[in-house]
């Protein structure tokens, strides 16, 4: 796991070089160009693609106007301090459209569905599913074999540095569109109903529902029948 505390994350972001990466499609007399080491180029005689930071690419384009006939720039961030993580290193199922920042830990056989947003310092345990559109804020911790329902939010805490992160223990099921505010601890095997707003810690094997969430009952066999997880969905 990342084990990043708030102070470490603040230092990481504060000291990180801020980057504006761009991809540029160019046409012209490209064989006459001298590309600096700061610009990666995949060009042929008259067309190609270059990659680099805008602070390097912009002056290069301006200095070579006579040789470059046409160009189109693609760019999706500005002065970004935290890049997206390299997904290839995880033994997990990560679907298209998930946005996962650097310094995130994802356990074996975890599932990250489309549109999930996972911020720096978050931790996801083995066999846990993060459903569509879920937001895991900075430093949010989710244990093993959990299901975080579509559209749910686990609030992040990076500032103030003294704040406690959300902690979800193993075997927890959270229904769609629930919100767990910062600093909340949800105990092992608990169930949070869809749409609940959790403002207090939840005891293990307890079901809560409502706004704000209140204890409904202890998790029983009937609850488990309705909230059981399917291990086949977690196979890689």
Curated annotation (Swiss-Prot):
Its EC number is 2.3.1.89. It catalyses: (S)-2,3,4,5-tetrahydrodipicolinate + acetyl-CoA + H2O = L-2-acetamido-6-oxoheptanedioate + CoA. The lineage of its organism: Bacteria, Bacillati, Bacillota, Bacilli, Lactobacillales. It holds the Pfam family DapH_N. Keywords: Acyltransferase, Amino-acid biosynthesis, Diaminopimelate biosynthesis, Lysine biosynthesis, Repeat, Transferase. This is 2,3,4,5-tetrahydropyridine-2,6-dicarboxylate N-acetyltransferase. It comes from the Bacteria. The gene is dapH. Catalyzes the transfer of an acetyl group from acetyl-CoA to tetrahydrodipicolinate. Gene3D superfamilies: Hexapeptide repeat proteins, Malonyl-CoA ACP transacylase, ACP-binding. GO terms for biological process: diaminopimelate biosynthetic process; lysine biosynthetic process via diaminopimelate. Belongs to the transferase hexapeptide repeat family. DapH subfamily. PANTHER family: 2,3,4,5-TETRAHYDROPYRIDINE-2,6-DICARBOXYLATE N-ACETYLTRANSFERASE, ACETYLTRANSFERASE. Pathway: Amino-acid biosynthesis; L-lysine biosynthesis via DAP pathway; LL-2,6-diaminopimelate from (S)-tetrahydrodipicolinate (acetylase route): step 1/3. One of its GO terms (molecular function) is tetrahydrodipicolinate N-acetyltransferase activity. Coiled coil: none annotated.
């Amino acid at each position: 796991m990342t084990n990043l505390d708030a102070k470490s994350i603040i230092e990481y972001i504060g000291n990180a070089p801020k980057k504006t990466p761009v991809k540029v499609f160019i046409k012209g007399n490209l064989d006459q160009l001298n590309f600096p080491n700061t610009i990666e180029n995949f060009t042929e005689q008259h067309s190609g693609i270059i990659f680099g930071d805008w602070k390097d690419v912009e002056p290069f384009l301006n200095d070579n106007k006579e040789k470059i006939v046409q160009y189109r720039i693609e760019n999706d961030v500005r002065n970004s301090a935290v890049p997206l993580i390299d997904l290839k290193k995880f033994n997990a199922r990560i679907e298209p459209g998930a946005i996962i920042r650097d310094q995130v830990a994802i356990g074996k056989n975890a599932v990250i569905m489309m549109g999930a947003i996972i911020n720096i310092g978050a931790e996801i345990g083995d066999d846990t599913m993060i459903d569509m559109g879920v937001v895991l804020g900075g430093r949010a911790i989710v244990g093993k074999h959990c299901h975080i329902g579509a559209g749910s939010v686990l609030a992040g805490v990076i500032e103030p540095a003294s704040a406690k992160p959300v902690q979800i223990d193993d075997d927890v099921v959270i229904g769609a569109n629930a919100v767990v505010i910062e600093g909340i601890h949800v105990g092992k095997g608990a169930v949070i109903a869809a749409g609940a707003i959790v403002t207090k810690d939840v005891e293990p094997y307890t079901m809560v529902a409502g706004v704000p969430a209140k204890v409904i009952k202890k998790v029983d066999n009937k609850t488990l029948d309705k909230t059981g997880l399917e291990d086949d969905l977690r196979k890689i």
